[in-house]
Amino acid sequence: MSWKTFKEAKLAAYSKAKEKGEVDSLIVALVEKINMNPDLVSLSSCSGRINLLRFDLDERKSTAEFFAKWHGPVDKEEFEMRLYSYTEKMRLWFKVEPFILHIAAKDMKSARRFLEKIRMIGVKRGGIQTMAKEKVLMEVQGNDAISVPADSVEEWGPLINIANRMMERNLDVLKKLEKIEW
């Protein structure tokens, strides 16, 4: 499949997902700016989130299910009401996850240019995942994350404050990424 055909298909899928409300609104401006570059296209994205995940006894990612999630800072009382409503036996984890972008580049030169630009604003976690004849696939993530079993936390206030600051820093980085000429 040619780069042009690949990019057109990805843009059509993005447009359809956006119409259905399936695209994270906090990252739309960045994704659309990246997609304007003829040599880049977004594959998937998330602006970051605070969430409560339930796991089976083996705590495998493949068995994880969302119990609650917030794309941005969360109110402590709202969080605690949701947390204390949990009555299931599966273990619950509190997680703060940074933004994540999966981007395809037309070629290695375009991928290198993209990665150099994200490094200039302080994003450390990004690189090439796979290379194919017509494209280079990259993953980029923010730097801040937390993952703890919810039953190990005695006082939620300080942890929620830290999580909210992490989400604010995360959104600040996304705004810096939006200002880059892709």
Give the location of each predicted region.
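Short, flexible, solvent-exposed loop/turn segments with mixed acidic/basic and small polar residues
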Residues: 84-95
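N-terminal, charge-rich interaction modules
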Residues: 1-86, 161-182
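Structured core elements
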Residues: 102-104, 139
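Short, solvent-exposed beta-strand edge segments and adjacent coil->beta transition regions
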Residues: 98-100
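Helix-rich interaction surfaces within compact, conserved domain-sized segments
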Residues: 117-182
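Helix N-cap motif at beta-to-alpha junctions
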Residues: 105-110
